Amino acid sequence: MSFIFKFIATFVRKMLELLQFGGKTLTHTLSIYVKTNTGKTLTVNLEPQWDIKNVKELVAPQLGLQPDDLKIIFAGKELSDATTIEQCDLGQQSVLHAIRLRPPVQRQKIQSATLEEEEPSLSDEASKPLNETLLDLQLESEERLNITDEERVRAKAHFFVHCSQCDKLCNGKLRVRCALCKGGAFTVHRDPECWDDVLKSRRIPGHCESLEVACVDNAAGDPPFAEFFFKCAEHVSGGEKDFAAPLNLIKNNIKNVPCLACTDVSDTVLVFPCASQHVTCIDCFRHYCRSRLGERQFMPHPDFGYTLPCPAGCEHSFIEEIHHFKLLTREEYDRYQRFATEEYVLQAGGVLCPQPGCGMGLLVEPDCRKVTCQNGCGYVFCRNCLQGYHIGECLPEGTGASATNSCEYTVDPNRAAEARWDEASNVTIKVSTKPCPKCRTPTERDGGCMHMVCTRAGCGFEWCWVCQTEWTRDCMGAHWFG
């Protein structure tokens, strides 16, 4: 009955909008697809303030069912009736899964095939959408155990992706499906707690109801595993096959760590995969990539491809997900791909055509000195000296100026020691950090007034926390204590 009243109220409001704005309706209605495990797909318009009970009351009659016979699954969770649409992080043309509840006897058989400790239950936490319960994957286990309710709000998971459609760094949404049938009517037995849970296979089991016969992982009837993937949150969904590359090194700077290059404290940063977890802002990361690209200082890695390490020179710090380099411009990324291809040819014992404007990669026999650029410019050259092919010994190389590796991107060791994610404070940062306007040394403020004194030996600059300039009488009068 409550749904009928809400429906009438919504209809009246829409009519008033139509009369007031001459046909230009102002509405936040979401057009959503509802899929069943019997092959049906419905298109419904949902108001953000509606709850899941309203959705069931709208969908059930179209399926010839009662609302109590349905359950709604989204992003790995069975949603409770009290969950509202606006809590679910839905976008236009998102997909909800409406599954008919199985008879009690049938449900009992399915549940008995799963491990008792992994059996999902619809507790308050389990019935909330994944975006409401998932904590930031950068948090350590100890931080998760000791987190308070106030800290939990700030530590909700936030993801970044490179979207090929938007062609930029975008906010991302985590989604989940069955690893076997790729269906979205899948509920996880637990939330992911680290990036390995999300990026690696066979980490988190769950229950799949995408098909009329539930999926099982093996002949013993073990539950299937979840497959996580990401979508762009900044454009209309392209359906369940929509995908965006996750940039797992880019994070919200919840620890307020300064950039190791410019020392600014940015909201969004990249954390290198080294033991110290050095931090850089996105602009400085682009500058780092651009300068290394200009000098062809990217390195071939047997597992990760053409990549870069931490600029502080840390061991075991190569970037694994090369989609991070798509933060460069399109032209720069095309250049990166060309250099990567050329590097592969050279590593395989090949040569590059030296003719200006060509650069074709050529794989030739080890003892072959005369090389012809086939399928390219047709230039014939000497493999040893890369000059036009000749009879006899190669001419000695000229004494021209040799190339230098004077990189524009440099890292101060003192800054690198301060720009470490692993030594920053935990989830709530009650102590904020800003760089001294004179020497750029990060300075902490833990309450008190806005009059700051740089703690770096030899500096001692007095400055205003608000203005980030030299402390003056104006600062004293306007915001000494905030």
Swiss-Prot record:
Zn(2+) 3 binds at residues 259, 262, 281, 284. GO terms for molecular function: ubiquitin conjugating enzyme binding; ubiquitin protein ligase activity; zinc ion binding. Zn(2+) 7 binds at residues 436, 439, 454, 459. Zn(2+) 4 binds at residues 274, 278, 310, 314. InterPro entries: BRcat_RBR_parkin, E3_UB_ligase_RBR, IBR_dom, Parkin, Parkin-like_IBR, Parkin_Znf-RING, Rcat_RBR_parkin, RING-HC_RBR_parkin. A zinc finger (IBR-type) spans 334-394, 432-473. Changing residue 296 to W: Loss of self-ubiquitination. The modification Phosphoserine is found at residue 94. The active site is at residue 449. Residues 255-482 are annotated as: TRIAD supradomain. Its main location: mitochondrion. SMART domains: IBR, UBQ. Auto-ubiquitinates in an E2-dependent manner leading to its own degradation. Phosphorylated. Activation requires phosphorylation at Ser-94 by Pink1 and binding to Pink1-phosphorylated polyubiquitin chains. Phosphorylation at Thr-187 by Pink1 is also important for mitochondrial localization. It is an enzyme of class 2 (transferase). It comes from the Eukaryota. PANTHER family: RBR FAMILY RING FINGER AND IBR DOMAIN-CONTAINING. This is E3 ubiquitin-protein ligase parkin. The gene is park.
